[in-house]
């Protein structure tokens, strides 16, 4: 009986405690201020297409854009071939010897995925060099290091990758600038934002590129010519004529070069020049605005006024 009385006394005290307990959870929003979402884009402002100057008309722009797209396609496949086969690839060893693959992969990837803000293609011939015989374009050098001029000759002489391994084309026997893709790859490597002052001319022409690879020097995987030749042969063998390609044979060291006299650039800084040490060759910009220059017997000139001596 006494126990029941004590329970009766305690029940009124416990009832308010039970009544104050919540019957359902309080929404989180009512208990705490939610964090504001953070919007962050690490690549904000990235430029993913090569800029083309307003001096290019509609047809010029379309051709340059298509050529640049093919340059990216050529570089992308070269990179993919290396990533798949490494230096087990016979084509890789042919052009790069036993060099590690990372440098060549990077040289192609910067064309494919690098930011393109500091590259500009134009058509208005600001330095006057398109008037020089045989010029299809040129890097503007110190006049404007990010700019490349495409001259009218390019529109009538460059071919598309779909025609590779036809019309007598071979990798060894034809010029690297046969195609828009490889011509623009070469021009891009002169621009600091792409070549970064590292891709350079250490060998000239097919035979020197092959000799450089056989020497296993350190230059082949950042030699402009080697990078072009490898990309062309890998594309020819894998894509254009699968399993067959069109490697061809060299026509000799002087193929495609003027060994007599050459027109000089209209300004001292428009040649795509640099020095190399890998093959004992030197590359010297022509530095006079005169109409012609004498070329030593051990030298020849590239399109764009570049003097290359061995």
Curated annotation (Swiss-Prot):
Residue span of region Disordered: 247-310
Keyword flag Cell inner membrane: no
UniProt-listed InterPro entries: HRXXH, MetalloPept_cat_dom_sf, PRA1-like
Major location (coarse): secreted
Gene3D superfamilies reported for this sequence: Collagenase (Catalytic Domain)
GO CC terms: cell surface; extracellular region; fungal-type cell wall
Keywords for this protein: Allergen, Glycoprotein, Secreted, Signal
GO molecular function terms noted in the UniProt entry: integrin binding; metallopeptidase activity; zinc ion binding
Compositional bias (Low complexity): 258-292
Subcellular location(s) of the protein: Secreted
Signal peptide: 1-16
Alphabetical list of Pfam families matching this protein: HRXXH
Compositionally biased intervals (Basic and acidic residues): 300-310
Glycan attachment points: 57, 87, 143, 216
Recorded family membership: Belongs to the ZPS1 family.
Protein name: Major allergen Asp f 2
Organism of origin: Aspergillus fumigatus (strain ATCC MYA-4609 / CBS 101355 / FGSC A1100 / Af293)
Source species taxonomy: Eukaryota, Fungi, Dikarya, Ascomycota, Pezizomycotina
């Amino acid at each position: 009986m006494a126990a029941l009385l004590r329970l009766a006394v305690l029940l009124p005290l416990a009832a308010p405690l039970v009544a104050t307990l919540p019957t359902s959870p309080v929404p989180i929003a009512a208990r705490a201020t939610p964090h504001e979402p953070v919007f962050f884009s690490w690549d904000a402002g990235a430029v993913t297409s090569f800029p083309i100057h307003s001096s290019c008309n509609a047809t010029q722009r379309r051709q340059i854009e298509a050529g640049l797209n093919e340059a990216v396609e050529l570089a992308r496949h070269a990179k993919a071939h290396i990533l798949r086969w490494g230096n087990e690839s016979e084509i890789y060893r042919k052009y790069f010897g036993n060099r590690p693959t990372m440098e060549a992969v990077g040289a192609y990837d910067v064309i494919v995925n690098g930011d393109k803000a500091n590259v500009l293609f134009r058509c208005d011939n600001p330095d006057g060099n398109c008037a020089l015989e045989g010029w299809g374009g040129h890097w503007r050098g110190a006049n404007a290091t990010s700019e490349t001029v495409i001259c009218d000759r390019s529109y009538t002489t460059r071919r598309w990758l779909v025609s590779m391994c036809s019309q007598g084309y071979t990798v060894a026997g034809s010029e690297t600038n046969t195609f828009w893709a490889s011509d623009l790859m070469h021009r891009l490597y002169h621009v600091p934002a792409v070549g970064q002052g590292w891709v350079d001319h250490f060998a000239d022409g097919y035979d020197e590129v092959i000799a450089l690879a056989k020497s296993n020097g350190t230059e082949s995987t950042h030699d402009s010519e080697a990078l072009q030749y490898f990309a062309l042969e890998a594309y020819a063998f894998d894509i254009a004529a699968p399993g067959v390609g069109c490697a061809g044979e060299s026509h000799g060291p002087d193929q495609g070069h003027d060994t007599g006299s050459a027109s000089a650039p209209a300004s001292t800084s428009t040649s795509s020049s640099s020095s190399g040490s890998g093959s004992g060759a030197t590359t010297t910009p022509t530095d006079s605005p005169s109409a012609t220059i004498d070329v030593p017997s051990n030298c020849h000139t590239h399109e764009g006024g570049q003097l290359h001596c061995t």
